[in-house]
A protein has these predicted regions:
Chain A
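HotDog/MaoC-like acyl-thioester-processing domains
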Residues: 1-15, 95-104, 108-158
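Hot-dog-fold acyl-thioester-processing enzymes
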Residues: 2-89, 154-158
Length: 158, 158
């Protein structure tokens, strides 16, 4: 199929131990507050003064905002050029250190498991470890995420 | 502390087996596309026609959008009236069924574990099962989430 020409990552292209590095993304206080106002309006996420007075000593990003920013980095790094068929879920998230206004985060991806589908030979599931760090090299969050990917079409169908 | 008067949920108030029901939230195609354009711009999340042509048969919400909507329901249901000290992480997410434009979701919360902190006697961690379902009663996603909560202040400090 000629329309597959933009796809660089099929299920077949993943190997345990592979490492990929995403680009980076800086988050502003306005973005932190805008996300949290919609989805996680706890005082330490949406209010400058309440954040400063909290145990965190300043506004911090909602953990869901951190995960969503990590997702965008992962989409831009490879998922948008992959045969992604969505995700059945996440095995674990750890929010290690707050993400604060002005922080710049990037993600390192490591392939942990490669599982061909038992019932559908045209696809398989990849377990990826996502490790986000900030501009100081400090870990801020990890995700162990599952992704389903289509297999590379057989040569006869090209 | 008089400023604690708005808090109805301290660590002490959780018991294994407790069930809480959130309100509900309806999501539009415009909201699905707006979220995904920022954080998860895969074709089946951001483009009406690409969604229709995909294995999903229509635009579906990013899994991170579904989790973020669930978070807002949980904040409104009880977290905003709790002694929440944030979350160390998530034990598992399962995206069971796509959330589509026009769907209305609500969440049932069940307390699974109550773990007093070993090192800090003023707090503890709760493991909650979040079960989201749509307007047809179909499960769409589950989250096993950790939350840290402060203990109720001793009477002598009131």
């Amino acid at each position: 199929m000629a329309s597959n020409s933009g796809i660089q990552w099929y299920f077949d292209d993943f190997e345990v131990g592979q490492v990929l590095q995403t680009g980076s993304r800086t988050v502003s206080e306005a973005e932190i507050i805008a996300f949290a106002t919609q989805f996680d309006p706890q005082p330490f996420h949406v209010d400058h003064d309440a954040g400063a007075a909290s145990i965190f000593g300043g506004v911090i990003a909602s953990g869901w905002h951190t995960c969503s920013m990590m997702m965008r980095l992962v989409v831009d790094a490879f998922l948008s050029q992959s045969a992604s068929m969505g995700s059945p879920g996440i095995e674990e998230i750890r929010w290690i250190k707050p993400v604060r206004a002005g922080d710049t985060i990037s993600v390192q991806l490591t392939v942990r498991e490669v599982r061909p589908s038992r019932s559908k030979p045209d696809r398989g599931v990849i377990l990826l470890l996502w490790e986000a760090s900030n501009q100081h090299g400090e870990p801020v969050a990890t995700i162990k995420g599952l992704g389903m990917f289509g297999c590379r079409p057989a040569p006869s169908s090209l």
